[in-house]
From Swiss-Prot:
<feature type="binding site">
    <location>
        <position position="353"/>
    </location>
    <ligand>
        <name>Zn(2+) 2</name>
    </ligand>
</feature>
<dbReference type="Pfam" id="PF01546">
    <property type="entry name" value="Peptidase_M20"/>
</dbReference>
<dbReference type="Pfam" id="PF07687">
    <property type="entry name" value="M20_dimer"/>
</dbReference>
<keyword id="KW-0862">Zinc</keyword>
<dbReference type="InterPro" id="IPR005941">
    <property type="entry name" value="DapE_proteobac"/>
</dbReference>
<comment type="subunit">
    <text>Homodimer.</text>
</comment>
<dbReference type="GO" id="GO:0008270">
    <property type="term" value="F:zinc ion binding"/>
</dbReference>
<dbReference type="GO" id="GO:0009089">
    <property type="term" value="P:lysine biosynthetic process via diaminopimelate"/>
</dbReference>
<dbReference type="InterPro" id="IPR002933">
    <property type="entry name" value="Peptidase_M20"/>
</dbReference>
<feature type="binding site">
    <location>
        <position position="136"/>
    </location>
    <ligand>
        <name>Zn(2+) 2</name>
    </ligand>
</feature>
<feature type="active site" description="Proton acceptor">
    <location>
        <position position="135"/>
    </location>
</feature>
<dbReference type="GO" id="GO:0006526">
    <property type="term" value="P:L-arginine biosynthetic process"/>
</dbReference>
<keyword id="KW-0479">Metal-binding</keyword>
<feature type="binding site">
    <location>
        <position position="101"/>
    </location>
    <ligand>
        <name>Zn(2+) 2</name>
    </ligand>
</feature>
<keyword id="KW-0378">Hydrolase</keyword>
<dbReference type="GO" id="GO:0050897">
    <property type="term" value="F:cobalt ion binding"/>
</dbReference>
<comment type="pathway">
    <text>Amino-acid biosynthesis; L-lysine biosynthesis via DAP pathway; LL-2,6-diaminopimelate from (S)-tetrahydrodipicolinate (succinylase route): step 3/3.</text>
</comment>
């Protein structure tokens, strides 16, 4: 059923922050199978649809956390079937926007949980879903707000699986247990414009900005840690608002981003960056403005018993030993980690957000097997059959 669920989910054009029927479809499906569900819409100007659904009323509560929203699909004519929101099956693969990020993992956990409930009437614990239509965007009224809401209602999650596409070369090779932080900067160096033939009557901000960027981009922030790669600064935009060749610009503006590990905080990095900027601007007798915003702090979890148990299930099911990682961008795991231990585990990440995003059907089966086996091992099923996928 996971392929059917995935094809149905691809059919909803759920561009951030719209559900466009995707969450409503899942809500109806889960209610049909005995889940207690609640759909909440948060936000005023951009309304975000969220779902919490739970089956059972005892501990432990194993929760799948995910998002139905997708990024724009680009030119539809570049897709195999010219319609990225109609699932296309070809040569053992399913194509469509959101296939790996992350409707495929939602489909797999849907199938695994419904099959588990059907096959096991004596389990101890609860299975739940927390889904949102805004993870790819601002993420203000999605998982973060829904977690606050359900905890205020008395719900508690004991362990979460975030279904982001984490695997690199094959299903099972990577489990994410943390994420890097992210901080964005906007620097405007303010000079005095003028004619290029009379530089003595102007103060060009560009030489100063070049020296600032040269120092910033050559800083070795750290050497990384056991689970984190080294922190990294990338320049993303430079603008002087000047297309004329004989005019010295008045202002030079640059945007840059730092992805940082747990050796830093947004505050310490901002202080370090501003010290460098201040020194150069004072030397060149220039003013500046600096704006920065951190969308996520870095975090890392110590692999506790439940995280290690999940890794063991992956290894037993797929005969591959997963590595713990913190690579990649930010995700809603940064909100979930404030409430419970978690793993991020899903499909391959290599086609996420790309034209002709796809997954192998065999990879869906592998992911389904891992999810199903984890439920079997965690929810105290007595007299259970051998784990799926094992030989």
């Amino acid at each position: 059923m996971h392929t059917t669920y995935l094809k149905n989910l691809i059919g909803f054009e759920s561009l951030t922050p719209q559900s466009n029927g995707a969450i409503e479809y899942i809500d109806d499906l889960l209610k049909e199978h005995g889940f207690k569900t609640e759909v909440k819409i948060f936000g005023e100007t951009e309304q975000v649809t969220n779902l919490y659904a739970v089956y059972g009323n005892s501990k432990p509560n194993i929760c799948f956390v995910g998002h139905v929203d997708v990024v724009p699909a680009g030119d539809p004519n570049l897709w195999h079937n010219s319609n990225p929101f109609k699932a296309h099956e070809q040569e053992g693969k399913i194509y469509g926007r959101g296939t790996v990020d992350m409707k495929g993992s939602i489909a797999c956990f849907l199938a695994a949980s419904l099959d588990f409930i059907k096959n096991n009437t004596d389990f101890v614990g609860s299975i739940s879903f927390l889904l949102t239509s805004d993870e790819e965007g601002k993420a203000k009224h999605g998982t973060k707000e829904m977690l606050q809401y359900i905890y205020n209602q008395g719900h508690e999650i004991d362990f979460a699986i975030v279904g982001e596409p984490t695997c690199e070369k094959e299903i099972g090779d990577t489990i994410k247990i943390g994420r890097r932080g992210s901080i964005n900067f906007k620097l405007a160096v303010k000079g005095l414009g003028g004619h290029v033939a009379y530089p003595q009557k102007a103060n060009n901000p560009l030489p100063c900005l070049i020296r600032i960027l040269n120092e910033l981009t050559n800083i070795k922030l750290d050497k990384g840690t056991e689970f984190f790669q080294n922190s990294n600064l990338e320049v993303t935009n430079i603008d002087v608002d000047n297309n004329t060749t004989n005019v010295i610009p008045e202002t030079a503006t640059v945007h840059f981003n730092i992805r940082f590990n747990n050796l830093h905080s947004a505050e310490t990095l901002a202080k370090q960056v501003e010290e460098i900027i201040k020194q150069h601007c004072q030397k060149h007798k220039l003013d500046y403005t600096l704006e920065y915003n951190s969308s996520a702090d870095s975090f890392i979890q110590n692999p506790n018993d439940k995280i290690k148990e999940f890794a063991t299930i992956v290894e037993k099911t797929l005969n591959i030993k997963p590595k713990f990682s913190t690579s990649g961008g930010t995700s809603d795991a940064r909100f979930v980690k404030n409430y419970c231990p978690l793993v991020e585990f899903g499909l391959l990440s290599d086609t996420a957000h790309k034209i002709n995003e796809y997954t192998k059907i065999s990879d869906l089966q592998k992911l389904y097997d891992v999810y199903y086996n984890f439920l079997m091992e965690t929810l105290n099923v007595t007299g259970s059959p051998p784990l799926l996928g094992m030989t």
